[in-house]
Amino acid sequence: MRRDKKRSRKRVCSFCVDKIEQVDYKDVNRLRRYISERGKILPRRISGNCAHHQRQLTRAIKRARALALLPYTAE
């Protein structure tokens, strides 16, 4: 059996494109783009972020959740 792989274009890191050095935990609108409708952090292969910014993004989302800027779960 042969599997047909869907070839998609490589996504680029939006933080690198916008030349953002540090991911800010207070920028809630930007962070919401990287959270699923269930409240989970999107993985790198889906979000298209580089490893450096994905680690920063994860830390920023967790920090924003601890400060009640973002919900832990979906509403």
Curated annotation (Swiss-Prot):
<keyword id="KW-0689">Ribosomal protein</keyword>
<dbReference type="Pfam" id="PF01084">
    <property type="entry name" value="Ribosomal_S18"/>
</dbReference>
<dbReference type="GO" id="GO:0022627">
    <property type="term" value="C:cytosolic small ribosomal subunit"/>
</dbReference>
<dbReference type="InterPro" id="IPR036870">
    <property type="entry name" value="Ribosomal_bS18_sf"/>
</dbReference>
<comment type="subunit">
    <text>Part of the 30S ribosomal subunit. Forms a tight heterodimer with protein bS6.</text>
</comment>
<dbReference type="GO" id="GO:0070181">
    <property type="term" value="F:small ribosomal subunit rRNA binding"/>
</dbReference>
<comment type="function">
    <text>Binds as a heterodimer with protein bS6 to the central domain of the 16S rRNA, where it helps stabilize the platform of the 30S subunit.</text>
</comment>
<keyword id="KW-0694">RNA-binding</keyword>
<keyword id="KW-0687">Ribonucleoprotein</keyword>
<comment type="similarity">
    <text>Belongs to the bacterial ribosomal protein bS18 family.</text>
</comment>
<dbReference type="InterPro" id="IPR018275">
    <property type="entry name" value="Ribosomal_bS18_CS"/>
</dbReference>
<protein>
    <recommendedName>
        <fullName>Small ribosomal subunit protein bS18</fullName>
    </recommendedName>
</protein>
<dbReference type="GO" id="GO:0003735">
    <property type="term" value="F:structural constituent of ribosome"/>
</dbReference>
<keyword id="KW-0699">rRNA-binding</keyword>
<dbReference type="InterPro" id="IPR001648">
    <property type="entry name" value="Ribosomal_bS18"/>
</dbReference>
<dbReference type="GO" id="GO:0006412">
    <property type="term" value="P:translation"/>
</dbReference>
